[in-house]
């Protein structure tokens, strides 16, 4: 086999993996359907900066980023405000999406990656069960390894045959549909909290935030089913009741996006194929942040590719990427998905109860892109645990739900621990089937 690698899509993890592999002597070409200057949404994004170091990417200029403000969370009744207390050494940085892409692309070019922009990848090119390249329209492009960084609706992952063993569909309640816009500020009202997050906003399966900047209000709306501009406008009108500084004029954004919020793929690899980033569902399930995870995964993938001295790039030789990712991040997010699924079944009154009785505190809402497992969220002393358990026992129905969630989290963790450490086709397929079935049951 050779050392020709195609990266499909300019996802953050794909860009970082391409750069690292090109720097190590591989012939890497990245294909992206958009023009170079059209990448990214017209808004900012946040991520953990240490992920850049993990991926071998230099820090951006200090002029390109600021540090994210702590979020303040409100239950449906807005009766309690819980503000994050993120330690200074764990604060995330905020950058323009376009600047993030420009930084990663410039780095990849310096490392020797070749780019073909405005080239749409439409399907995998197969030789039996092996991915041997991609179709770009009618054009066939061959490679020894294809890295899928095409995102949530990847035309590669969704077209792989069953024999590859890779899930094609995202699954019900596993997509966050997002509307985001920056509205010009109006009036002289200044909110008490700069970054407000409303849970089950309006009593719906909806999260909304209002992040106040000097000249605009950054509004984001998240639902778990598609919605349009008319619905978004109604929600913004509701938000003005508590945040009257949200003006009528959209100065930036006004766009919709889709984000996977679920457990990682059960199979990240197949012969000649590896998925990364949103293509592999690598976001933090509770908040949808995925840039840092994709960057960290890129390093694991690069190390795995380099370790394959024969450049066979089979599912067997790529399996180290899968086990490495699950060890570092995947197991924690698989367990966290159980909590996300349970949150979607919560009633507004139950969320109010958790806030108002002090069962949820500032500790638990201090979730960042560095929150890789539930243990890092639940830093309770035994005394705190007992006190909160007593409060929870006053609501028997909610207590039953919490016990069920705890059982599911334990099962997910145990299931991930059973993932085969060494490639064995039958064992791997059996494990993947059990993993997929476990989460399918939670959707019923």
Regions of interest found by a model, annotated:
Residues 86-106, 224-231:
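Short beta-strand to alpha-helix junction loop
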Residues 37-74:
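N-terminal FAD cofactor-binding segment of flavoenzymes
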Residues 306-444:
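C-terminal helical "tail/cap" subdomain of flavin- and related membrane-associated enzymes
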Residues 107-245, 281:
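Predominantly flavin-linked oxidoreductase catalytic cores and closely associated redox partners
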Residues 1-11:
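Beta1/beta-strand and adjacent pyrophosphate-binding region of the FAD-binding site
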Residues 14-15:
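N-terminal Rossmann-fold NAD(P) dinucleotide-binding loop
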């Amino acid at each position: 086999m050779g050392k020709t690698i195609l990266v499909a899509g300019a996802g953050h993890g794909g860009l970082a993996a391409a750069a690292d592999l090109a720097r190590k002597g591989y012939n890497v070409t990245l294909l992206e359907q958009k023009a170079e200057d059209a990448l990214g949404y017209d808004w900012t994004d946040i991520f953990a900066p240490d992920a850049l170091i993990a991926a071998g990417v230099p820090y951006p200029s200090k002029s390109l980023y600021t540090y994210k403000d702590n979020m303040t969370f409100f239950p449906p009744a807005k009766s309690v405000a819980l503000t994050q207390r993120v330690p200074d050494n764990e604060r995330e940085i905020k950058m323009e999406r376009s600047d993030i892409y420009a930084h990663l692309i410039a780095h990849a070019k310096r490392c020797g990656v070749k780019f073909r922009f405005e080239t749409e990848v439409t399907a995998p090119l197969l030789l039996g069960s092996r991915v041997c390249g991609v179709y770009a329209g009618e054009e066939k492009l061959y490679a020894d390894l294809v890295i899928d960084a095409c995102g949530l609706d990847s035309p590669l992952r969704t077209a792989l045959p069953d024999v590859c063993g890779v899930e094609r569909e995202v699954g019900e309640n596993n997509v966050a549909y997002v509307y985001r816009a920056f509205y010009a500020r109006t009036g002289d009202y200044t909110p008490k909290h700069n970054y407000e997050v409303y849970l089950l906003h309006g009593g719906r399966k909806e999260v909304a935030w209002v992040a106040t900047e000097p000249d605009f209000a950054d509004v984001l709306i998240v639902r778990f089913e598609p919605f349009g501009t008319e619905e978004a406008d109604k929600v913004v009108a509701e938000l003005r009741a508590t945040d009257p500084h949200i003006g009528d004029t959209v100065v930036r954004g006004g766009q919709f996006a889709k984000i996977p919020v679920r457990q990682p793929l059960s199979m990240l690899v197949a012969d000649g194929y590896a998925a990364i980033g949103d293509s592999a569902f690598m976001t933090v399930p509770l908040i949808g942040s995925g840039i840092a995870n994709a960057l960290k995964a890129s390093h694991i993938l690069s190390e795995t590719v380099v370790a394959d001295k024969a450049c066979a790039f089979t599912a067997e030789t790529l399996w180290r990427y899968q086990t490495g990712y699950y060890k570092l991040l995947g197991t924690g997010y698989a367990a966290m998905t159980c909590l996300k699924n349970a949150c979607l079944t919560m009633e507004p009154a139950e969320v109010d109860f958790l806030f108002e009785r002090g069962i949820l505190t500032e500790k638990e809402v201090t979730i960042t892109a560095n929150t890789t497992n539930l243990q890092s969220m639940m830093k309770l002393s035994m005394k705190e645990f007992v006190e909160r358990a007593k409060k929870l026992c006053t609501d028997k129905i909610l207590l039953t739900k919490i016990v069920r969630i705890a059982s599911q989290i334990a099962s997910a963790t145990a299931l991930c621990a059973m993932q085969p450490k060494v490639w064995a086709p039958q064992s791997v397929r059996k494990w993947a089937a059990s993993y997929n079935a476990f989460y399918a049951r939670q959707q019923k």
